[in-house]
UniProtKB/Swiss-Prot annotation:
The lineage of its organism: Bacteria, Pseudomonadati, Pseudomonadota, Gammaproteobacteria, Oceanospirillales. This is Carbamoyl phosphate synthase large chain. Pathway: Amino-acid biosynthesis; L-arginine biosynthesis; carbamoyl phosphate from bicarbonate: step 1/1; Pyrimidine metabolism; UMP biosynthesis via de novo pathway; (S)-dihydroorotate from bicarbonate: step 1/3. Residues 404-553 are annotated as: Oligomerization domain. Binds 4 Mg(2+) or Mn(2+) ions per subunit. Large subunit of the glutamine-dependent carbamoyl phosphate synthetase (CPSase). CPSase catalyzes the formation of carbamoyl phosphate from the ammonia moiety of glutamine, carbonate, and phosphate donated by ATP, constituting the first step of 2 biosynthetic pathways, one leading to arginine and/or urea and the other to pyrimidine nucleotides. Mn(2+) 3 binds at residues 828, 840. One of its GO terms (biological process) is 'de novo' UMP biosynthetic process.
């Protein structure tokens, strides 16, 4: 039966900011759903608080709301837009929870809105652990032995029945938030307490331990006529006990017998039928006991998920697009498969003739205090996917695509003495981010497959595959390049070995190895992802490399532009860069170029098969990019949009004759190299903070004294402020030097005088090489010293004098012309005591480009891509800066809740995973909405409220204004001695509270007794930061709002004065008033 005609308009709820457990895969699914439904003639209304998404581009929906995803804000949107239906299955857990809230508060009933894609009963049955357990019993399937607890007493009762270890999982959370494995009473108490706080219905499921069992996922799609297909069966390389988002996963499943697969297939279909998912995609997770073969259903997600994005990219079957069409009444047999050009219907189960491996990307280096062991709570921030003809090939491609400095199964332990072996065994028994490397090391040390299976519970089949790779490496290390025959070289490349790894094993330079390989005629061929194992022809150029005979690339002779993507998400390089790559591809396609995308991140829109004309799902490494460039012969390659990943390759690509368009690699180097940059700043007569470069510890101490403390120290060439710190004296610098010089890669350490209490500004600009147009000026809310990616910022600036802004515009334009920028450029400036200082210049895409584009209503990335391809700003009609008539605030979102031991203080090292945007007529309104969108607690506006203040000496004067504002808002004040004395001298009423080391009762006791509603706590110096970290960690755990900068505290006071009225505005209407 074709689509429904009784609904005309549909509200899609997005997933909000990127957080651990919920990343850009929901931008990919949401963007697909928007396209699919508009294709069918429906009016699409979208709400999503994340400006860095493609789905919030104003062209993707008829009405776009970048607003907080709370049921109260969405109610306002429903009231204004009157949709007929709401589709909550495209925005992850955020959208499901919001839809359930709308249902619970009677909003859907009040406005006559139908929930499509999944109904409230099905969502509740899948999400409510008790109901799900009962449902499985009804269809004769087993769940892990488990019971639901609503209180600590019930939890202890259940634990006594199940024993230890037990697995704890809260209801209605994603990414395993608040869950964990408890081996003893102390851990049990801690995990349950945290779990109860995070579950929105105060409910925990306590399971028997399935640690060491095999884990599988089935991606299933079902329509209303009960047609069901399995899109993909995914097997976890890591056994149960590691969250599936943190596991290495492989598709199709490798170690199931056909009978086991059919049983699991039947079971997953039965689960969907029982839960009542009638229209769309779901994923069902199974555990299998390797000893007895017992199968249990672990859980199911009645929505598009992280693994469905992976399954879509792995098979070419667009689950989100199909699910959206099923939600409006189509059946699978009525929909055709795009990849085969409609030659097959969507009811054909995909079959694949290759192996896909996904490996998660972790950023534990950002959180040294965090527990880096992998458990049932997800900790990875991104992932990489690779496709090969064999498991070995796809695994090795994925390992080099991770960009963690590994070219393959690189050794982590070099000496197999007692200490080395103890370290290896520890890493094998309790999984960390690099366990697979330690498995290889254990094999090098002589452990057998059987011993490794006992230590890790990783299936023997995978271990045998790894053993073969390790053995091959050991044999190779005894030989020289000159004695290898072409046949042997070909066999090595078929196993997925990278040129760099083979060169390392053979003791030659990578480029010499590559020359020898190519001279022997050993080159990759490109195969197509076609959903049907080459049974039908495919018109879609979605490709991966392999070492085989026949190439399916079918290269055209059209002029081509190649865009290099950013690889896996990580803190410091996320969805914002993918957004820029997508926009570059769209602009170039519109201008008549054939567009080629190279990337290996399965979550993103850039790796959707219809974003570009040709997609190469390949690691973004020199070897892989050179081979594609040689095959395609593009007219130009864009390396400036994907963050550091492609930029790192720029020089070598250029040297190999690859045509890089836009700002030259030399100009990029001029901006990034300290000494060359200094020359440029001096030449233009601009100012920089006093700075120096040190190549040894002694030199660092001498130069730090000369430029004066406090100083910011960092290694050269970093993104996201890796290993960047503020040091306040020589002992802190010494401490830093012992840790940081390791990451310096023989490159020096940079020292800058730190501009205390300066206002920091970010400016994005576009240049065509002659003319420069400012994209937007953003004023940071936190003072200098907080990484620009972590600071909230406002556009237009809310307190920066107009003449200062004009001078900044002038400086940016002069620098762009001097550097010969062609494309995007981002400049960070600071204003202190009437002087403007240049902090840094990046002649490339920055993470603020999507936010600025949403504010001004013009895609800066598209304008810049056209400049790079030789179309001037005048020809594009983009000749003057657009200053919006409304305020927008970008707020960062942090993963601290996933890492309970980490101090949530902001520093020059970037820690945020995502961002939200709030807009309003005033700065206060925009800031308030950004806080709501970020899920930040905002102090209550009524009742008895106490604010606790404890600030560093330089802030003692400034805190008086904050205290006055808080008193005016009805707060009572308490403060530590020094701060209290400053407030008392200003005549303000305040109670004195002990610092933690001054005796009880102290500040943390107050917090734990729920006696504090708001905290302002600023510190400087390593000792003071350590002393006060318990205050911030306790505030975070107890959801008490806090500010760690005075500027942040002032902004919160303004937001509180604004009140809590919720207004919603359509992005298209906002933009109508800002056109040039």
């Amino acid at each position: 039966m074709p689509k429904r005609t009784d609904i005309q308009s549909i509200l899609i709820i997005g997933a909000g900011p990127i957080v651990i457990g919920q990343a850009c895969e929901f931008d990919y699914s949401g963007a697909q759903a928007c396209k699919a439904l508009r294709e069918e003639g429906f009016r699409v209304i979208l709400v999503n608080s994340n400006p860095a998404t493609i789905m919030t581009d104003p062209v993707m929906a008829d009405a776009t709301y970048i607003e907080p995803i709370t049921w109260q804000a969405v109610e306002k949107i429903i009231e204004a837009e009157r949709p007929d239906a709401v589709l909550p299955t495209m925005g992850g857990q955020t959208a499901l929870n919001c839809a359930l809230d709308l249902d619970k508060h009677g909003v859907l009933e009040k406005f006559g809105v139908e929930m499509i894609g999944a109904n409230a009963d099905a969502i509740n049955m899948a999400e409510d652990r008790d109901l799900f357990d009962q449902a499985m019993k009804r269809i004769g399937l087993e769940c892990p032995k488990a019971k639901v607890a609503h209180s600590m007493d019930e939890a202890w009762q259940i634990q006594s029945e199940l024993g230890f270890p037990v697995i704890i999982r809260p209801s209605y959370t994603m990414g395993g938030s608040g869950g964990g494995v408890a081996y003893n009473k102390e851990e049990f108490e801690e995990i349950c307490t945290r779990g109860f706080e995070l579950s929105n219905n105060h409910e925990l499921l306590i399971d028997e331990s399935l640690l060491g069992w095999k884990e599988y996922e089935m991606e299933v799609v079902r329509d209303k006529n009960d047609n069901c297909i399995i899109v993909c069966a995914i097997e976890n390389f890591d056994p149960m006990g590691v969250h599936t988002g943190d596991s290495i996963t492989v598709a199709p499943a490798q170690t199931l017998t056909d009978k086991e697969y059919q049983n699991m297939r039947d079971a997953s279909l039965a689960v969907l039928r029982e839960i009542g998912v009638e229209t769309g995609g779901s994923n069902v997770q199974f555990g299998v006991d390797p000893d007895t073969g017992r199968v249990v259903v672990i859980e199911m997600n009645p929505r598009v998920s992280r693994s469905s994005a992976l399954a879509s990219k792995a098979t070419g079957f667009p689950i989100a697009k199909i699910a959206a069409k099923l939600a409006v009444g189509y059946t699978l047999d009525e929909l055709s498969n795009d990849i085969t050009g409609g030659r097959t219907p969507a009811s054909f189960e995909p079959s694949i003739d290759y192996v896909v491996t996904k490996i998660p990307r972790f950023t534990f280096e950002k959180f040294p205090q965090a527990n880096d062991r992998l458990t049932t709570q997800m900790k990875s921030v991104g992932e990489v996917m690779a496709i090969g003809r064999t498991f070995q090939e796809s695994l090795q491609k994925a390992l080099r695509g991770l960009e963690t400095g590994n070219d393959g199964l690189d050794p982590k332990v070099t000496r197999f003495n007692d200490d080395g072996m103890a370290h290896i065994k520890g890493e094998l028994q309790v999984a960390g981010a690099e366990r697979i490397f330690y498995v290889a090391d254990a094999m090098r040390a002589g452990l057998s497959v059987e011993e490794l299976f006992r230590l890790t519970n990783i299936d023997r089949w995978f271990l045998v595959q790894l053993e073969d790779l390790v053995r091959t490496e050991a044999e190779l290390a005894k030989r020289s390049l000159s004695e290898l025959t072409p046949r042997e070289l070909f066999a090595l490349k078929r196993k997925g070995f990278s040129d760099a790894r083979l060169a390392g094993l053979l003791g030659v330079a990578e480029k010499d190895f590559r020359r020898t390989r190519q001279a022997a005629g050993i080159r990759p061929v490109y195969k197509r992802v076609d959903t049907c194992a080459a049974e039908f022809a495919t018109d879609t150029a979605y490709m991966y490399s392999s070492y085989e005979e026949e190439c399916e690339a079918e290269v055209s002779d059209r002029p081509k532009i190649m865009v290099l993507g950013g690889g896996p998400n990580r803190i410091g390089q996320g969805i914002e860069f993918d957004y820029c790559c997508v926009h570059a591809a769209l602009a170039m396609r519109d201008d008549g170029y054939e567009t080629i995308m190279v990337n290996c991140n399965p979550e993103t829109v850039s790796t959707d098969y219809d974003t570009s004309d040709r997609l190469y799902f390949e690691p973004v490494t020199l070897e892989d990019v050179l081979e594609i460039a040689d095959k395609e012969k593009p007219a130009g390659v864009i390396v400036q949009f994907g963050g550091q990943t492609p930029l790192k390759l720029a020089r070598e690509l250029e040297a190999a004759g690859v045509p890089i368009i836009g700002t030259t690699p030399d100009a990029i180097d001029r901006a990034e190299d300290r000494e060359r940059f200094q020359h440029m700043v001096d030449k233009l007569g601009l100012k920089q903070p006093a700075n120096a470069t040190a190549r040894s510890x002694e030199e660092a101490f001498a130069k730090a004294e000369a430029i004066g403390y406090p100083x910011v120290v960092r290694p050269s060439y970093v993104l996201g402020g890796x290993a960047m710190e503020i040091v306040y004296d020589a002992s802190e610098l010494e401490n830093y030097m012992t840790h940081a010089v390791k990451v310096s890669n023989d490159s020096p350490v940079l020292l800058d005088h730190f501009l205390n209490c300066a206002i920091e500004v970010d400016i994005d600009a576009v240049s065509d090489g002659h003319q420069v147009v400012i994209g937007g000026i953003m004023q940071h809310i936190e003072q200098a010293g907080v990484h620009s990616g972590d600071s909230a910022c406002a556009l237009p600036p809310y307190s920066l004098p107009a003449e200062v802004q004009d001078e900044m515009r002038d400086q940016v334009k002069r620098m762009a012309v001097e550097l010969g920028v062609k494309g995007l450029m981002n400049v960070q400036l600071a204003w202190q005591d009437g002087e403007i200082y240049v902090i840094e210049v990046n002649p490339r895409a920055s993470r603020t480009v999507p936010f600025v584009s949403k504010c001004v209503g013009t895609s800066l990335a598209q304008v810049a891509a056209r400049c790079m391809a030789g179309i001037s700003l005048a020809e594009q009609g983009f000749v003057e800066e657009i200053v919006p008539h409304f305020y927008s605030v970008k707020e960062a979102v942090f993963p601290f809740a996933k890492f309970p031991g980490v101090d949530p203080i902001l520093s020059p090292e970037m820690k945020s995973t995502g961002e939200v945007m709030g807009s309003g007529d005033t700065f206060a309104e925009a800031f308030y909405k950004a806080q709501l969108g970020a899920g930040e607690a905002i102090p209550a506006l009524e009742g008895e409220r106490k604010a606790f203040l404890s600030v560093r000496d330089p802030d003692k004067q400034g805190v008086i204004d904050v205290a006055r504002s808080l008193l005016g808002l009805g707060f009572t004040l308490c403060a530590t001695r020094g701060t209290a004395s400053a407030l008392q001298q200003a005549g303000l009423p305040v109670d004195v509270v002990n610092k933690v080391y001054e005796g009880r009762p102290h500040x943390v006791d107050l917090l734990k007794n729920d006696x504090v509603a708001y905290i302002v706590n600023t510190t400087e110096g390593r000792q003071a930061i350590n002393d006060s970290s318990v205050i911030r960690r306790t505030a975070l755990a107890r959801k008490v709002p806090y500010a760690t900068t005075l500027a942040g505290a002032n902004a919160v006071c303004l937001a509180l004065e604004y009140g809590n009225a919720i207004t919603v505005r359509r992005l298209q209407e906002l933009h109508a008033g800002v056109s040039q």
